[in-house]
Every structure is written in C-alpha cells, then in structure tokens.
C-alpha cells in the first residue's frame, strides 16, 4: 500500500487559467477544460498559459470529478488540481484506480490535500501498472468503437424508416 501523495505531483492551475470566458466552438483552438461532466467548456485563442507538459489528471477539488488529459489545454477554475505521475508510476493506472473509487462529495470544500493525498492505494510494479492501464485503455477504445457503430445503426434505421413511409 502506498499513499496517493507518493504517486502523484500536483500543481495549482493559476498560470493556466483562461482570462476570456467568451469561448469559441472552433476545435482548432486550445480547449478550456473543467473536470465535471461537460469537460470541454469551449475553445480559446489565448496563446499564453497553456498546459503543455504532457499527460495529466485534472481533479476538481470541490466535486472530486476527475479527467485524464493527454493534450494541450487551459482551465476555467482555480479549484482544479493538475496531477502528474511521480517516477515509476503509470498515470493512467492511478487515474483508473481513482475512477474506480467513484469519488464524490456534496460538501463545498477542498478535498485533495486533506482526503485524497493521504488515501492508501495498491500500487503494483511499473510493468504491471502499464499492463493494466493499457488493457483498460483497449477496453475504452472498444467501448468507443461500439458506441460509434451503435449511433450509425440508429442513423441507418432513421433513414430506412424515413424512406419506408414516404
């Protein structure tokens, strides 16, 4: 068992906060993220304060929502913690572990340092972490593919029904 604080570094988001909240829908711009269900709030053309350090987990300190991020971004809220892996820790593994715990809170307080960092988790060796993370990622890819196929079948059915009852 190891404490979460021994697996992850955290960074305050201050230098990555978006200044203009008049977001664009142009996906060629930099996404502005939140850790809650909406995830991408919109896009910004701000060329400063962009998080560009690679993979991270964004953690909402109030709601305890988490998202795995592997692209450039900015954030909207100072309640976001940006988490990165310490040496010999697979970030995706820790993300999946924390996701499995279904963290949530109804209290409007900061949780990461007081509740999450001291939490103990099972941490296998790095090779096993990577194997588990890759396996779970392949399942995510399969789910995404099946969902896209499902949506295509729905569209095909709608097309057939529209042409059947003309």
Label each region the model flagged:
Residues 1, 91, 157-158:
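Alpha-helix initiation and N-capping motif
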Residues 1-37:
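Non-catalytic DNA-recognition/assembly elements of restriction-modification systems
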Residues 4-6, 64-123:
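Basic, amphipathic alpha-helical recognition segments used for DNA target recognition
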Residues 8-11, 98, 164:
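Hydrophobic aliphatic residues
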Residues 21-32, 45-77, 98, 108-114:
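Short, surface-exposed loop/turn microsegments at beta-strand edges and helix-strand junctions
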Residues 38-39, 64:
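Short, glycine-/Ser/Thr-/acidic-enriched flexible segments
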Residues 41-43:
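Short, solvent-exposed loop/turn elements at domain surfaces
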Residues 122-166:
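Amphipathic alpha-helical coiled-coil/heptad-repeat segments
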